[in-house]
Every structure is written in C-alpha cells, then in structure tokens.
Amino acid sequence: SSWDGTMYQYPVDGDRHYLKYRKDVIDNPEMQKKYKADTGKELKVPTTWKEYGEMAKYFNGWDWDGDGEKEYGSAEVMKKDDLMFAAFYSRSAAYSKNPRTPGGFFFDLETMTPLINNPGFVEALTDWVDAVNYVPPGGINFGLGDEINSFGGGQTLFSFSWDDAFVAAMQDDSPIKNQVGAAQLPGADKVWNRENGMWDAKANQAPFFVWGWAVGVAKKSKEKEMAFDYLCFFANEANHQADIGIGRFG
C-alpha cells in the first residue's frame, strides 16, 4: 500500500469474496434436465445475481440431495452488525462499479459525496430483500459462523463470502466433502453510470476484495530493509496457497 510513491504497508492477505456452490447439483445432468423442464432455463453456475436468485428460489425448501432433510437456496451473512455490510457490498459491486467511470465506489472522489443511494446500490438491495425468500429458517439472522456451518454442513445450494465456508465443506466430517465448487462472484446484466445518470446495458462483473490485512514497519526500526524483505517472503504465493487450505478459516 503506497501513497504518492511511498510504500507504507505491505499487503499480506487479500480477503476477496467468491461464490460457493454444490457441484453435485449444478453439474448433475438429471437436475439440469429437471430445472430446464420446470423453468425453461439452463442450470449452470450463475453469472448474474438475478440467475443466482432464480436458482436459489427453485432449490429452496425441498430435499434435493436425498438426505431426508430439506435443503435451501442460499446461506448469507444477513445479521445486523455481523459483517452484513460485506455481503451487501459484494452484491452491489456488479451494479455500481462501472469500468467506464473510474474512481470511487463508496464516494465520489472529487466531491466525497456518498454513492450509497445511487440506483446500482438500490438494485442490489432490492435483490437482497428478495433473498429472504430462499435462505434457511432463521437465515435473516445468520452471522458469519452460521453461514459457514450452513453451507459447510450441506444445508444450502449457494453461499458467498470468504474461504471459510468452502474450507468447512471440505473437512472430513462434512457431508458434502468434494461436492463443492468455487467461482467468481455473480455479476449483472447492467451497471449504473453515474456520469450520465443512466444504466449501461452491458454485462459487468466486479470481484470485490472485502477486508484484507497489511503489515507496516515501524518508523524507528533500524532494519527497515530486512523487515520488508521478510514481508516479501511471508506474503509469497506459495505461503498464500498453503494458508488458504489450513483450518476452518479463510
């Protein structure tokens, strides 16, 4: 992380959100045939939030994996003050972050006017309000731990957040080990253009880095170069790859 050409922090963890889904459903020819017959649409990894919602609704509230229990559409962090904001921003980015209008996502960089009320964010909120129709019972009060356990325990078709739910799903005690897939966050078929005040009717995906960690070196350190050299090692690709798969955390 730098400002005006001077490095102040070294990124060591990029906490991006991504989509988790049940491969045994999405890639299942019989399920694809049934979904096509019932909806007229293809069952595939969703590339837009509208598709995500349609599929999640279809697979909500019935036993689609044959375990004797009802499954649901999506596990999401919806609980107030429990990282709910992160889930909302991930849903908002595709509608609001237009590559034709570079600059701020949360604020206009020239005026610092908040952008949270623009139609892109409103469209995402409209989708999210509808999501209460395809989450598990009590899902509107799910915190991060609930989302992890719900998807990781085989309760839902989809979830999206950090690595935790995927890692949980791949544990030896998970009923869905090796039955989950990962993909980029869904996008949108339109994106708000704040410069002309209109929707751009174009496909848009905007992967969102939610959170992240960085390390700095103390100003009074006598070995700044050595410290930064260690950080380069600590944050190398091999260490990141190893870190992703360790434990029930992202």
What are these regions (language model features)?
Residues I26, E51-F59, G145-S159:
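Short helices/loops that flank or line small-molecule/ion binding pockets
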Residues T39-K41, D63-K70:
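Acidic, glycine-anchored loop motifs typical of Ca2+
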Residues K33-V45, E110-T113, V129-G143, Q155, ...:
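A local structural motif
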Residues W49-F59, A87, A94-N141, Q184-K190:
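Glycine-centered hinge/linker elements that transmit conformational signals in sensory
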Residues N133, D173-G250:
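Extracytoplasmic/periplasmic substrate-recognition and gating elements
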Residues L157-W162, G181:
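Paired acidic/hydrophobic, glycine-rich loop segments that form the ligand-binding mouth/hinge
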Residues S1-K41, G53, E76-E110, Q205-A218:
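Periplasmic solute-binding protein
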Residues G152, S161-K177, D189:
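A ligand-binding cleft/hinge motif common to bilobed small-molecule-binding domains
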